[in-house]
């Protein structure tokens, strides 16, 4: 039996040159000996005996397809249903792709949470079922029988606040667990949130996930534009958790209001809305509006963290145990059953803005959960109107230091103000009810007399793409394609403050990577095709580094039942998960994933337009990507 152990993270961070040399090391040993993320020490083992998948599983329908392969529903001999993801090696274009797959497998196999999709375990030995042969990598995963949250919301007029809170708490619990273990997901969206047979959340697709370090920055611009944070769309380095917090705010808005917060009809409008935090003010405000506003803060230093969300009053309303306390209980801690005075005071300090907007319910919540109610703590009924959080006290300083927000002084306005584009509540009618005007869904312009652009009311489910064009949550992340469209480039760790990028001059200097999309750069697919192999060989040795000729038959000629072939597979085992041991950080790698789209006649590709003086930012794209056009297609038809 061959065993390859993962290296422990060194006590001191390696230098940038060491990281570069490590990432550039030739890959020649397949998935078993590919470069590995530096996580907790564990081993990847290969058995000498072979496995025939046809004898082991009964394959049923296809759940989803991606660039690398497909996901099939299958039934094992015990009767248990599983989801089997097959990855064809001839679809893996370069070393970074294989490294990316390796990282996804090891991150998923290391996580152990009830609301995260699990790689299937065999019996009580907790062996991860991953198979590999000369042409395929096969991953056996947990099957979520009720589809994804996208379909669940589509089938219902609107979720009740109770149901929205139920789903949101489970999402927060899983994401909080990831952040505690140093993992950032970076692709949170409805399609990647599955539901099991009991209607519980299962977060899937860790294809764009990575490990992060405090004090260091990532520079991978990835994920869906509709869920992307201002740092992502503007090409700014980020630590990691703050981009998940933004996506969490978008998800909460969808769960509560049934539509997308940002509805730009093109990329420039969308980026402007996201950069200003100008989300659509709902006609019927919810009690969750304060938390949504906190999560959709443009300044990442003022944005709510997962700890803030886990202890927020709206998330824990009606529950005797907070989300953070549930995590402590699951890890073997002994927290109190209810919020005590100390935790309540800490919660008050971090949640002053929601308290100001929902004072009555907060006082009721405090009396309900603190022994003795308001009688034991005098003056707390008015405490929420007097106390300010540290985030709010530092608002003016943060605004001055944040380039993502408009800090220009305006006459007659205080220096302590909300970020530009954060919508104010609509004026009430004489009866005290909020006026529901579908035309007044845009932010009110700051300049007096400036007309408000008329916007037609989008349907509640305008965010949803056609079901036949969507991919499964097991395979929904953008994956490499030959179109040259990339939604993410390489991960780079930057110590200290990010270096400010200067705008290009008109002299035609070389433009560097910035923003979501990039044209034919050193990280683009077209640049890699001439220097990297197009296919991989056997399990233990990949093909030569010289470019290989394309196969004579198209990929579509591969049989639909190719996964059911009589080929023998080697089983790769990962040992038992150790939830009590924190995951170790790792050097991030290049994420070379693109959005596959067939060329359409009569529609000019975005890179055919004149880029002018752009920096390859998302704002320079004259045409939307395929995913965004599909997302808005049904919106325009139904409106």
Swiss-Prot record:
Residue positions, PTM N-acetylmethionine: 1
GO MF term list: ATP binding; magnesium ion binding; protein serine kinase activity; protein serine/threonine kinase activity
InterPro entries for the chain: Kinase-like_dom_sf, Prot_kinase_dom, Protein_kinase_ATP_BS, Ser/Thr_kinase_AS
PROSITE patterns the UniProt entry points to: PROTEIN_KINASE_ATP, PROTEIN_KINASE_DOM, PROTEIN_KINASE_ST
Key words, A-Z: Acetylation, Apoptosis, ATP-binding, Kinase, Magnesium, Metal-binding, Nucleotide-binding, Phosphoprotein, Serine/threonine-protein kinase, Transferase
Post-translational modification as stated in the protein's UniProt record: Phosphorylated at Thr-220 by STK11/LKB1 in complex with STE20-related adapter-alpha (STRADA) pseudo kinase and CAB39. Autophosphorylation is also possible at Thr-220.
Coiled-coil residue windows: none
Name of the protein this chain belongs to: NUAK family SNF1-like kinase 2
Designated gene of the protein: Nuak2
